[in-house]
């Protein structure tokens, strides 16, 4: 997988975002502001490697994605993350991207994370509490729930944006059902070989699907299979 800078060259959150801008990955002010506000270092155990452009293990056979992948997904969803919009983050892990989403949609919007490992949900809430997204958690526009992300989170559907942080063999119907007409879903699809797919829902309920790039994610699976390392 492509790495955009060496491990030793970046050791600050702002410098990480500037590098993403210099490489043309972050192209909008809104995404840059959100990533600058939400310090990635708060969401990883090894802060010395927090800003390296590489995925990092977070336990339970899963990883936090590399910064350039988070930035790419934020850019792909940017027009669907305006203030007041609703966003669902499936496989929310450390809570980092959920926090970025919350900053972008603001207090009038809603950012929902779904993660099926209870321990990760608990630690992600602590991470968010220590971040710039803490006010959104306190007043209720940001929440993280224990659940099977393949089923989405119907309580606050439909969503303007849905992000999936693990690879599904095919796009779960529940996520398409919970996507608002005019909304966008970004999801890695495939088994060994995966594509990051952009799914746009049309006004008549049909969907248009585009392959954005080849990727490698951990599988979107059951909690039991994940803990076994299947």
Swiss-Prot record:
Active-site residues from the entry: 65
Family matches, as Pfam families: PCMT (PF01135)
Purpose: Catalyzes the methyl esterification of L-isoaspartyl residues in peptides and proteins that result from spontaneous decomposition of normal L-aspartyl and L-asparaginyl residues. It plays a role in the repair and/or degradation of damaged proteins. Contributes to seed longevity and germination vigor by limiting the abnormal accumulation of the L-isoaspartyl residues in seed proteins.
EC numbers: 2.1.1.77
Activity versus pH, per record: Optimum pH is 7.0.
PANTHER family associated with the record: PROTEIN-L-ISOASPARTATE O-METHYLTRANSFERASE, PROTEIN-L-ISOASPARTATE O-METHYLTRANSFERASE 1
Protein name listed in UniProt: Protein-L-isoaspartate O-methyltransferase 1
